[in-house]
Structures are given as structure tokens and as C-alpha cells.
């Protein structure tokens, strides 16, 4: 096991499927003041929508179906994202479902908190750890891969 420092200014990925985009924008608006103190990232359409609706700067990746979910997963693996808020639609099959599953897997693997609904996102953003630096524990993957 090893500890990795998560900075007080979090790097937060914001992602939503089409049927959940309005809900995510509403959540961001409700927490705009807190989120303005952090660095925001998003997939193409979601990031654009959040930026337009809230005035917050959002660094944008590709749209989810075009590889944006995979780009976010890569940033997690590189240690460049600290939190994921992903409002996904559990009732609609997505053409990029394997990418979504891969993103969930990478977030768990690298111990990155992920909120998949508004209640969990509310709990996360109200946590004392949200605004301070935090030491998270990671498995030592090199040792696991050698066995």
C-alpha cells in the first residue's frame, strides 16, 4: 500500500448521460460557490453545457461516445483527477457502455471517489475532506502484477 496526497484544490470530472445532463447542471448550480474553488473537467457536451449555464470554467475532453470517458479514465490513471461526478442513465443502453464500465473500474482501482447520483454527490461535496488536502491509500499495483 502507498499513500498519495490529494490537494485541497480538487480536480473534478463532471460527466452526464443525455437524460441526466439537466440534473448535473442543476447540481453544479446548487454548489457553484464551492465548485468555483476547484478545477473542473468534463466530457464535451456536458462540459460545454455546465460552462454556459454556470459561467464556471470547464476543461473539456471529447464527448463520451467519442472517447471522452476513456480520456477521463486515463487522467485518473495518471493521477490527474481527484473526484468524478458521473450522473449516468441506468435505464438507457448507451453505445459506449464498455467505456462507462471501464471508467467505473479505473475509478475504483485508483481509489477515486465517484458519485453516480445527486445524493452521493451531495454527501461528497459536504464532506470535510472536500476542501482540505487528503492522503488516500492505493494498492501497490506493481506487487500485485508480479504475483
Swiss-Prot record:
SMART domains: MGS. Keywords: Lyase. It catalyses: dihydroxyacetone phosphate = methylglyoxal + phosphate. One of its GO terms (biological process) is methylglyoxal biosynthetic process. Residues 4-147 form the MGS-like domain. Its EC number is 4.2.3.3. The active site is at residue 69. It is an enzyme of class 4 (lyase). Substrate binds at residues 17, 21, 43-46, 63-64, 96. One of its GO terms (cellular component) is cytosol. GO terms for molecular function: methylglyoxal synthase activity. The keyword Lyase applies. The keyword Lyase applies. Catalyzes the formation of methylglyoxal from dihydroxyacetone phosphate. Belongs to the methylglyoxal synthase family. This is Methylglyoxal synthase. It comes from Leptospira borgpetersenii serovar Hardjo-bovis (strain JB197). The lineage of its organism: Bacteria, Pseudomonadati, Spirochaetota, Spirochaetia, Leptospirales. The gene is mgsA.
Amino acid at each position: 500500500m502507498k499513500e498519495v496526497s490529494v490537494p485541497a484544490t480538487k480536480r473534478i470530472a463532471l460527466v452526464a448521460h443525455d437524460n441526466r445532463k439537466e440534473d448535473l447542471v442543476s447540481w453544479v448550480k446548487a454548489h457553484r460557490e464551492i465548485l468555483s474553488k476547484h478545477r473542473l473537467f468534463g466530457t464535451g457536451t456536458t462540459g460545454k453545457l455546465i460552462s454556459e449555464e454556470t459561467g464556471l470554467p470547464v476543461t473539456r475532453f471529447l464527448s463520451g461516445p467519442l472517447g471522452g470517458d476513456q480520456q477521463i479514465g486515463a487522467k485518473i490513471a495518471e493521477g490527474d483527477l481527484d473526484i468524478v461526478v458521473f450522473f449516468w442513465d441506468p435505464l438507457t443502453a448507451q453505445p459506449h457502455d464498455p467505456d462507462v464500465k471501464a471508467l467505473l473500474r479505473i475509478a475504483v482501482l485508483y481509489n477515486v471517489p465517484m458519485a453516480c447520483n445527486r445524493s452521493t454527490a451531495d454527501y461528497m461535496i459536504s464532506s470535510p475532506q472536500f476542501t482540505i488536502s487528503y492522503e488516500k491509500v492505493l494498492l501497490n499495483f506493481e506487487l500485485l502484477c508480479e504475483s
